[in-house]
């Protein structure tokens, strides 16, 4: 993957434009449209109403990234929505504390979309932190090749203090009891 092909992730918590992505499967089948339509301002939606195909579909990138098919094979017949590769720049990459509150269907309950992270490239100096409702926080060190479910509706932040860019393959998967059981088994290994 060429870093120049990654699109800046438009958001007010993308400090210094150091968070970028590519779409493998997403809205309109466009490699550089990394957000959901719900994240766009109403004026943009009106202006682009006729231009955009809002269906979720694969982009040409899907066939070019073997890790995607490997991960999709692991997931088997789980229904999935968006698939993205998100990069957090080395040394300066930071996502300020935020929630993904526009993802109203996110979660681990039946029929909700569980956001799974599969680190493709990372380093020990990448720090992910998530806050709970009681104000306590948890830090996660996600290793390459591991699978993580993260509830992005909770406040969270990510910082890359390392000397290597961080790349995560992120897939939104339709949740059910089988997925919850599978995630529990995966976490026990």
Where do the language-model regions lie?
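A ubiquitous, low-specificity "background" feature that marks scattered single residues
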Residues: 38, 104-106, 178
């Amino acid at each position: 993957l060429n870093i120049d092909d990654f699109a800046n992730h438009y958001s007010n918590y993308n400090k210094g434009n150091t968070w970028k992505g590519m779409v493998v499967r997403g809205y309109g089948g466009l490699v550089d449209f990394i957000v959901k339509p719900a994240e766009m301002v109403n004026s943009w939606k009106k202006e682009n109403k006729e231009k955009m195909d809002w269906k979720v579909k694969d982009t040409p990138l899907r066939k070019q990234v073997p890790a995607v098919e490997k991960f999709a094979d692991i997931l088997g017949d789980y229904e999935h929505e968006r698939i993205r590769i998100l990069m957090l720049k080395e040394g300066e990459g930071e996502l300020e504390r935020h929630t993904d509150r526009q993802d109203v269907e996110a979660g681990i309950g039946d029929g909700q979309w569980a956001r799974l992270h599969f680190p493709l490239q990372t380093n020990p100096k990448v720090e992910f932190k998530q806050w709970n409702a009681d104000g306590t926080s948890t830090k996660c060190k996600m290793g390459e090749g591991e699978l993580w479910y993260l509830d992005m509706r909770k406040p969270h932040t990510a910082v890359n203090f390392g000397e290597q860019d961080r790349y995560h393959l992120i897939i939104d998967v339709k949740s059910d009891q089988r997925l919850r059981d599978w995630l529990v088994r995966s976490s026990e290994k």
